[in-house]
Amino acid sequence: MSEPARPPGWLPKAEFDSIFSRVPRLCVEVVIVAADRGVLLTLRGIPPNVGTWHIPGGTVLFAEPVVEAVKRVARYELGLNVDVGELLGYIEYPSHYNNGLDSPVGLAFRTEPIGGLPSAEQLPDGCAWFSRLPAGLYEEQREFLAHRLGLPPDPA
């Protein structure tokens, strides 16, 4: 059986790790907010920080337009087609490079699901709406969401 086709710009893990251990990695963050529900977060399924809540995001592929990367990540992480809106800002991740990992920089975009906001029942496993920022959320993302969107932390 042959391997599935890889997207343009795909790198084997060893090459990816080698490159991004030396240079910053451009990422996109998919921010979906609803006044009556809060922000949509997902549980990380890959290292680092497996099992923690985070803003859905991913690496921009070689020669991929940033807006297309946002749409691709939304489809992959959330199963949603989105319209890409305002650039909310960027998130640097010192927790990564301070721990000997890579050095990602995430461009955070407000997005709107095409066809309306999904209900909790329509979301894939590991996704949830939060009106307060949960414990265990990436610290850099917690600071960003609190500052940019005014979301309070969960008191628990």
PLM region descriptions:
Residues 1-29:
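Acidic, metal-coordinating catalytic segment for phosphate/diphosphate chemistry
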Residues 38-77:
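Conserved Nudix-box catalytic region and its N-terminal flanking loop in Nudix hydrolases
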Residues 91-117:
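Active-site-adjacent beta-strand/loop module that shapes the phosphate/pyrophosphate-binding cleft
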Residues 24, 66, 141:
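Hydrophobic (often cysteine-bearing) scaffold residues that line and stabilize catalytic clefts
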Residues 81-90:
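A short coil-to-beta-strand element that immediately follows conserved catalytic motifs
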Residues 108-110, 119-151:
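NUDIX/MutT-family hydrolases
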